[in-house]
A protein has these predicted regions:
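Class I SAM-dependent methyltransferase "Motif I" SAM/SAH-binding loop
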Residues: 75-79
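Class I SAM-dependent transferase core
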Residues: 1-72, 102-119
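S-adenosylmethionine
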Residues: 82, 91-95, 99-214
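Aromatic pocket-lining residues of Rossmann-like dinucleotide-binding sites
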Residues: 85
Length: 214
């Protein structure tokens, strides 16, 4: 089966713009496969596994982002989760932050070829860009453990902003390990969503970081 076939089967039934998301997300995956030998963007090339781990995983918690005006995807890599989420939520502006120049150029080509009007690519370190710009939500997926992620993204918590970390099934120890960092900065980490992936390919947890109101 093709990427498009797999996505039409696997995407959540209640996903907004489901058919369009399936078509454009499949094209995104095709572009990754084309560029993979040159850029080493992913080790997952099986259509079904890629559809699940790269797209279904990214879009399942889409409701967490629907009221945001601007979202930053920190360390976007080949475009996950920012590009799949941008397909589901065309009214939300997404900024893909990727400091590796060759990956940023790849992302720019994807945005251009998929005609993603609500997406921009910035070839800059996430922490540097976030120090100068305000967004509603920062996404971190497979970037750093919470112990490093807390100090890295804490400066972005301005004006009610939130950091959402895509994590694996058990984050209890990771949250506890990061407690000294959150306590001294008056921040809070909490689990706000859990979900399983199709074909028993794992469970996911979304951890939210916010500033404690005084």
């Amino acid at each position: 089966m093709t990427f498009a076939d797999e996505l039409r089967e696997l995407l959540p039934a209640d996903l907004p713009l489901r058919d369009e998301v399936a078509a454009k997300a499949a094209r995104h995956l095709d572009l990754i496969v084309e560029a993979n030998q040159q850029f080493n963007l992913t080790r997952i090339v099986s259509p079904r596994e890629a559809a699940i781990k790269h797209v279904v995983d990214c879009v399942t918690p889409w409701r967490l982002f629907k009221n945001a005006d601007r979202v930053a995807d920190a360390g976007s890599g080949p475009g996950f989760p920012g590009i799949p989420l941008s397909l589901v939520l065309p009214e939300v502006r997404f900024t893909l932050l990727e400091s590796t120049q060759k990956k940023a150029r790849f992302l720019e080509s994807v945005v251009r070829r998929l005609e993603l009007k609500n997406v921009e690519v910035v070839a800059e370190r996430a922490e540097d860009w976030l120090a100068k710009h305000r967004v509603a939500i920062v996404i971190s997926r497979a970037v750093a453990p919470l112990l490093r992620g807390v100090p890295l993204f804490a400066p972005a918590l301005r004006g009610g902003a939130r950091i959402l970390f895509y994590k694996g099934p058990d984050v209890t120890a990771e949250i506890a390990e990061a407690a000294p960092e959150t306590n001294k900065r008056q921040l809070r980490l909490r689990v706000i969503e859990r979900y399983g992936l199709p074909d028993d390919l794992g469970a996911r947890t979304i951890v939210e970081m916010t500033r404690v109101k005084s």
